[in-house]
């Protein structure tokens, strides 16, 4: 496996890869926290640092194109936003009894904010 990440997804993928004895390389920007890098490495991931998140994505896409790696591609995978459309959005709407007026979310892959806003 190979994936570009800025942190949380990479940590989760490193944990799962370790559980299933799958090799994984994670590409991330060089300004990522040392803690995140060490956590991924502790789970057995190979971490490659690039200049930016965009260059991390380019690196992962290029490696996947070689046929030696499979890329989950969190940034373009429609299941990313669909998961939040089907679960997160309806849960927020239900829990606020439809009275929600504002929703604040980080903009990592934008999957959460895109999916939840479609509800």
Where is each model-derived feature located?
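A short, small-residue-rich loop immediately preceding and capping a beta-strand
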Residues: 1-29, 99-112
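Alpha-helical segments flanking ligand/cofactor-binding loops in enzyme cores
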Residues: 11, 15, 37-38, 90, ...
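Amphipathic, positively biased hydrophobic alpha-helical segments used for protein targeting
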Residues: 18-21, 55, 117-119
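Small/polar-residue-rich loop-to-helix segments that shape phosphate-bearing ligand pockets
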Residues: 22-102, 106
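Conserved PLP phosphate-binding loop immediately N-terminal to the Schiff-base lysine helix
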Residues: 82, 111-114
């Amino acid at each position: 496996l190979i994936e570009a990440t800025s942190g949380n997804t990479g940590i989760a993928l490193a944990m799962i890869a370790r559980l299933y004895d799958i090799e994984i390389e994670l590409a991330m920007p060089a300004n990522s926290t040392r803690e995140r890098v060490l956590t991924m490495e502790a789970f057995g991931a190979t971490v490659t640092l690039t200049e930016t998140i965009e260059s991390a994505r380019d690196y992962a896409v290029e490696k996947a194109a070689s046929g030696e790696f499979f890329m989950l591609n969190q940034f373009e995978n429609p299941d990313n936003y669909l998961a939040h459309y089907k679960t997160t959005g309806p849960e927020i709407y239900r829990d606020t009894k439809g009275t929600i007026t504002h929703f604040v979310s980080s903009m990592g892959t934008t999957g959460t904010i895109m999916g939840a806003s479609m509800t």
